[in-house]
Amino acid sequence: CNGVFAIRYGLECIDADPMDIGIPHFHNCLDSNNGGIVNSMLKHIKLGFGNTTEFLSYDIRQGRVTREEAIKLVKELDGRCHPRYIEDYCYWIDITVDEFWTVANSFRGNMWELDTDSVWRLKNPIWKQVPFNDNIDIYEVIDRIDSRRVALEKSQHSPR
């Protein structure tokens, strides 16, 4: 993967909790704390899936995760974005957080519905369609596919 290659040659990745950034692959959030993280959340709002779904589909095909593990990670991570990243992004582009949400929600796809608690929920998420083990430890899976660790292992076993 390009991320592993770049890390082997000195790229430093974000140091963040995946629950805050909504992405299990740290090499996706490089240039700043706001652009990539907020973009992934906006993708989720508009299309109903974010970078977690996209990246894990590749990981499934490469045999790095099982479909069941991917479903658990998608359920827990896809679309997550800590409010501080949204606030930083709004400051960066000089709008209010309310303006941000007005625009973001205007692009929300029809796969969403507003529940009785006024929380947006996917109408038919994969974790309600396919049985899976909801007790999977997402941090164990994230650690196993962490591109920083993979890059370190590859650099120890092969010359640059």
Residue ranges and their predicted role:
Residues 1-160:
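Nucleotide-activated chemistry modules centered on ATP-dependent adenylation/adenylyltransferase
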